[in-house]
Amino acid sequence: MTKITNDLFLKAARKEQVDRIPVWYMRQAGRSQPEYRKLKEKYSLFEITHQPEICAYVTKLPVDQYGVDAAILYKDIMTPLPGMGVDVEIKSGIGPVIHNPIRSFQDVEKLTIFKPEIEVPYVLDTIKLLADDMLDVPLIGFAGAPFTLASYMIEGGPSKNYHQTKSFMYREPEVWAILMEKLGRMTANYLIAQINAGASAVQLFDSWVGALSRADYAEYIRPVIEMIVREVKAVHPTTPIIMQAVGASHLLEEWETMPLDVVGVDWRETITSARKKVPTKAIQGNLDPSTLLAPEKCLKEANRILQEGVLEPGYIFNLGHGVFPEVPPEMLKQLTNYIHERSEILLKKDDIK
């Protein structure tokens, strides 16, 4: 296995002292990069993600180009679902489309047991290739969290309000619990397999869980998240687990009482206020990705965020959501350099101004 020579990200995830703030970006690999767009002229998304050498190349690009302190596996949160019998298609301009949406107990009952080594060997081969031969920074594996996956499976695709998902959850609580159990087992097994293959950390993407109230989260979602984290930690107790959601600041206190290591926040929550709600966790975030299209504003906001981030150990600079396709790669390189240089200065100062 290639030795990790830059462990800033892992130190921050463990709330240890660092000499500069680590930085990486959600969706840092892929559609905003000219090299990726050139690949897409020759290969489909399916081909890119199913060929370990190509997928590893795409995953590593931001490390080489931007100098980020962690790589995140280039995959989709839908990747494991076909291994459970879900007929999913990623449509350009739309996103995931489910051709056999869940409508009943019978549909949930049909979901099969997911075995990562059998269903997604190409994912594990990509991780092994990166960890063994290509990276000197930590590799982050990831999975979609059960609520977000269920919302696609029930709605049949992207949704703005999740009415069908919520009504199913409210009307059929017993069936919902079975669905969560199945998705939870799949997610835990998937994350464990990624760590076994060489991932240094894992992130749970619960993109749409902010649509739920805290009371509903506690009743319908918290048990399965606790189960996932518990099962992963039982096998890999020292591997950092990150929880990432959008518009979910009202759920921070729920995550504080789980054995998570890092909590991601978006631009709706300041780093300072987030720390008060999750004092035992490292914080990741929280630049609005829209500012990447306004360079002067971007660096100004980054400086403001850093002023708060450096006040305590356990801070990782990131966005509150993913990189847009329109973002120039040069902007991400400039921002990465700025975060490294500015945070190093701030961390050396006794008085932060």
Curated annotation (Swiss-Prot):
This is Uroporphyrinogen decarboxylase. Substrate binds at residues 27-31, 46, 76, 152, 207, 321. Pathway: Porphyrin-containing compound metabolism; protoporphyrin-IX biosynthesis; coproporphyrinogen-III from 5-aminolevulinate: step 4/4. Its main location: cytoplasm. Catalyzes the decarboxylation of four acetate groups of uroporphyrinogen-III to yield coproporphyrinogen-III. GO terms for biological process: heme biosynthetic process; protoporphyrinogen IX biosynthetic process. Belongs to the uroporphyrinogen decarboxylase family. Its EC number is 4.1.1.37. It is found in: Cytoplasm. One of its GO terms (cellular component) is cytosol. Keywords: Cytoplasm, Decarboxylase, Lyase, Porphyrin biosynthesis.
